[in-house]
């Protein structure tokens, strides 16, 4: 099974949907063509169970189940559509009385992101899958370009200055600044070191540029209740960014004349999403 490292590697070959690395034993008769997530249909049973949050103990695992190597605490699954394009479906939380709003928040924050970052923002849409509400977005990696999260690089992941220097060396300073401003405007509390990073050439691991901006489901204050708005200024003291210490201050520090002009052009902005 996959409950131990040896079993996980034997079944998955340590393949992920982020890159093209994989491993096999010296005498194992298996090829990339057989285990590649980019070339093979996904296991629909495992996909459905991962999305529904059901345990996989006792289930016969499949080599082509990208859910087994996908990070994140929210229930999610990958699906390939008829045209071959791969999408991630991500559910909201449940349990609390104000739970489950994360897909709505991700879609709304995505609209803001599209205005600020354009094609450098991954688009999200609201859908239902297996009877449950979810956000849906396209995969942005392929067999040529992979994704490496910033957590893999030896820098201070919470320091705006360190991150700015890092991305500037890749020619992506403006994109990083726009991401920070977006997170400030949408109160994104989850821009941790796994939720932004670098596109690399899979064959050489050469860094190309900052990856497009994604993962917005904890933007837009999904857990704020109606009563909180009566003292929202005080309530906001409970919230802060992962990069920097204060949403307003870090947004101001990241601002440029170019970004300011974009925001001024959004003065009449309205969400097209209506639920």
Q: What are the residue ranges of the model-derived segments?
A:
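Phosphate/dinucleotide-binding and metal-coordinating scaffold of catalytic cores
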Residues: 1-181, 185-187, 199-275
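Conserved protein-kinase catalytic-loop segment immediately C-terminal to the catalytic Asp
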Residues: 192, 197-200
């Amino acid at each position: 099974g996959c409950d131990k490292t040896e079993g996980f590697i034997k079944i998955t070959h340590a393949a992920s949907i982020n890159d093209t690395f994989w491993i096999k034993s010296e005498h194992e008769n298996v090829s990339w063509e057989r285990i590649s997530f980019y070339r093979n249909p996904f296991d629909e049973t495992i996909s459905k169970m991962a999305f529904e949050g059901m345990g996989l103990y006792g289930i016969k695992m499949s080599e082509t189940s990208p859910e087994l190597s996908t990070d994140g605490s929210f229930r999610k699954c990958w699906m390939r559509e008829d045209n071959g394009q791969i999408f991630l479906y991500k559910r909201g939380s449940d349990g609390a009385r104000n739970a489950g709003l994360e897909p709505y928040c991700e879609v709304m924050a995505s609209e803001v992101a599209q205005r600020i970052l354009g094609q450098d923002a991954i688009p999200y849409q609201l859908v239902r899958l297996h009877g449950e509400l979810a956000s849906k977005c396209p995969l942005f990696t392929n067999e040529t370009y992979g994704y490496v999260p910033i957590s893999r690089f030896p820098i201070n992941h919470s320091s705006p200055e360190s991150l700015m220097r890092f991305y500037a060396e890749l020619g992506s300073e403006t994109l990083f600044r726009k991401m920070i401003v977006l997170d400030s405007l949408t109160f994104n509390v989850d821009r941790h070191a796994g939720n932004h990073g670098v596109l690399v050439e899979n064959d050489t691991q050469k860094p190309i540029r900052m990856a497009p901006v994604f993962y917005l489901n904890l933007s837009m204050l999904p857990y704020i209740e109606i009563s909180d708005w009566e003292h929202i200024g005080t309530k906001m003291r409970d919230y802060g960014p992962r990069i920097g210490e204060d949403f307003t201050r870090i947004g101001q520090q990241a601002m440029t004349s170019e970004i300011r002009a974009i925001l001024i052009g959004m003065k009449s902005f309205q969400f097209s999403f209506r639920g």
